[in-house]
Design a protein with these regions (language model features):
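C-terminal anchoring/interaction modules
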Residues: 1-20, 25, 286-524
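Extended, helix-rich architectural segments
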Residues: 1-185
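Charged, low-complexity, helix/coiled-coil-prone segments
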Residues: 2-8, 37-55, 63-75, 93-96, ...
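Structured, contiguous alpha/beta core segments that scaffold functional sites
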Residues: 8, 139-300
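Long, contiguous amphipathic alpha-helices that act as assembly "spine/axial" helices in icosahedral shell
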Residues: 31, 58, 99-141, 251-286, ...
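Short, mixed-charge, low-aromatic patches
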Residues: 57-68, 77-84, 93-95, 216-224, ...
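Short, hydrophobic/amphipathic alpha-helical patches that form generic packing surfaces
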Residues: 63-71, 260-279, 432, 451-458, ...
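Flexible coil/linker segments and helix-coil junctions enriched in charged and small residues
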Residues: 87-91, 185-192, 434-438
Length: 524
């Protein structure tokens, strides 16, 4: 069966999710999701929402997720030894050398990510996940490419495993004319609008074949000669992502869809407030028919001008809807706060006594809401993304080949980073309570400082290798400092002894005689 036929067949299952995504996009970021088969071929007038709360929430949530999944300063993964595969006589020196090698590999991968535009593509994919609930990421040799929901269809089994993916995109004929005969490319060169087009519809068909994925591209039901590819499941470059999953559904649902009611209500109230405020701001004067003041005289009068007439004959039209506007304004404020909390937009209490601790607790409560999102994205995105990155680096020779049975990559971002943050808070509170209850001496007597430093570093995701001195090094330096201090004390005691009256020749005759005898003694 041709890829175009499969795409049209599977598009019927996608229509409901695509329509919900389009409605969610209209209230937040209208440019993200277009119609059923609309492409970015020309300018289209998009409807602008009357409120920007939804757009701000989507951008904020996507940015927080991106920084949590791919942090800038720290690594999102670590290479660790599988303890079950190592012997008990494994020397600690060898383990330290391996840790240094692993750290070098991690730096190489992070440098390659920083040099590419992966974070830009990941942020775009997360925006689609927040709004539409679905996105397809393709990891090519040139970087990441994001497919919106209206450009691909997917088929999954009962367990949610991907069976088939078909994408549709428009590509210039000049790029693929060497792979197909000219007469094939000339088919359907006139669009539905009776306009000549230099682009053709290219369908990419990805199917699962046992423990691997195979794919090819078709144009007008003809396979492109250089488009075939295959990859094992664990390093598959096609990564379909879902935000919220429902058992039995092949597509996900976005964060916006969960709070679409509040967004629609806020949109209606914002429109009413904006239009009502514009009507109330309009100034219209009325003149009594029996007044001596003519409307033309009033209209022509400048600022500060003097005209003839009575003030009672001139009035101003007032809307008189202040109470109604106040009710709508208060309800809109309530909806805005609820939407901001849903999209993890931190609202600090405006007061003169807002403390840093209150801000920190508010931020921590917002981060704890990301637990479920981190868990899903860690499994669906970070694991295949890391496997593909490591495989490409090994093929290019940038890093040595990693034995899978001994070394295993572990994700330390996302939900794991959130758990480390909670461990840090618990440890800090424990030490603070211990110092306040038993005093600082108790910490020095009962707490293992070396272990505290290691746990705090682990909670921050910091590698302590060659950074923090070991207890043996600290003890050696303390012993050397103590010996140096004792030597200085002995030297000072000798100097002080020379200054005592017993050793002073002017005050002790015996010492003076001994010095004279030493001077009179001839040299040998």
């Amino acid at each position: 069966m041709h890829a175009r036929t499969r795409y049209d067949y599977l598009a019927s299952d996608r229509s409901q999710f695509l329509e919900e995504a389009r409605q969610a996009s209209e209230l937040t970021l209208p440019y993200l999701i277009r119609g059923h088969e609309e492409h970015m071929s020309g300018m289209k007038q998009l409807k602008t929402p009357f409120q920007s709360v939804g757009a701000k929430g989507c951008v904020t949530l996507a940015s927080k997720l991106m920084l949590a999944l791919l942090p800038v300063q720290t690594s999102f993964f670590k290479l660790q030894l599988d303890e079950s595969q190592l012997g008990e006589e494994f020397p600690p020196e060898m383990r330290s050398e391996l840790d240094l090698s692993f750290a070098k590999v991690e730096r190489i991968i992070l440098e390659s990510i920083s040099a590419s535009d992966d974070r830009v593509a990941v942020h775009q994919a997360l925006l689609h996940l927040v709004v539409a609930g679905n996105a397809l990421v393709y990891m090519s040799k040139h970087g990441l490419k994001v497919y919106p929901l209206n450009r691909y269809v997917v088929d999954r089994d009962g367990n949610g495993q991907v069976i088939e993916i078909v994408t549709k995109e428009k590509i210039s004929k000049d790029l693929i004319e060497s792979q197909l005969p000219r007469e094939v490319l000339e088919i359907n060169q006139v669009t539905d609008d009776n306009e000549y087009s230099d682009n053709v519809d290219v369908y990419t068909h990805i199917k699962r074949d046992n423990n691997r994925y195979v794919w090819h591209q078709e144009v007008n039901d003809k396979v492109l000669t250089e488009s075939r590819g295959k990859a094992p499941i664990d390093i598959n470059p096609w990564i379909p992502l879902r935000f919220n999953t429902v058992d039995g559904e092949g597509y996900g649902r976005g964060r916006v869809g969960q709070f679409i009611g509040d967004l629609k209500s806020l949109e209606g109230l914002s429109q009413a407030l904006v239009e009502g405020s514009a009507a109330a701001a309009k100034v219209v004067f009325t003149v009594s028919p029996s007044s001596t003041t003519k409307p033309s005289t009033l209209a022509a009068a400048g600022n500060g001008a003097i005209i003839q007439g009575r003030p009672d004959d001139i009035g101003v039209i007032q809307v008189g809807k202040t109470a109604d506007f106040r009710t709508a304004y208060e309800m809109a404020g309530t909806l805005e706060r609820r939407i901001s909390d849903a999209f993890l937009v931190m609202n600090i209490r405006q007061s003169e006594r807002t403390t840093a601790e209150e801000v920190r607790m508010t931020q921590m409560e917002l981060e704890q809401q990301l637990g479920g999102l981190f868990s899903l994205l860690t499994v669906d995105f970070l694991v295949p993304y890391l496997n593909r990155k490591l495989n490409e680096a090994q093929k290019k020779g940038e890093i040595p080949k990693i034995p899978k049975n001994i070394v295993k990559p572990t994700i330390v971002a996302g939900i794991n980073a959130l758990g480390r943050g909670q461990d840090r808070e618990s440890l800090s509170q424990f030490l603070t309570i211990l110092a306040q209850t038993l005093g600082p001496e108790a910490i020095a007597n009962f707490i293992n400082t070396d272990e505290v430093i290691k746990r705090l570093a682990a909670s921050q995701g910091i590698d302590v290798l060659n950074l923090v001195r070991s207890m043996q090094e600290v003890q050696q330096e303390a012993q050397a400092a103590q010996q140096q201090q004792m030597a200085m004390q002995q030297q000072q005691m000798a100097v002080d002894a020379m200054k005592t009256p017993v050793m002073d020749p002017s005050k002790n005759g015996e010492v003076a005689m001994m010095e004279q005898q030493a001077q009179q003694q001839p040299p040998q």
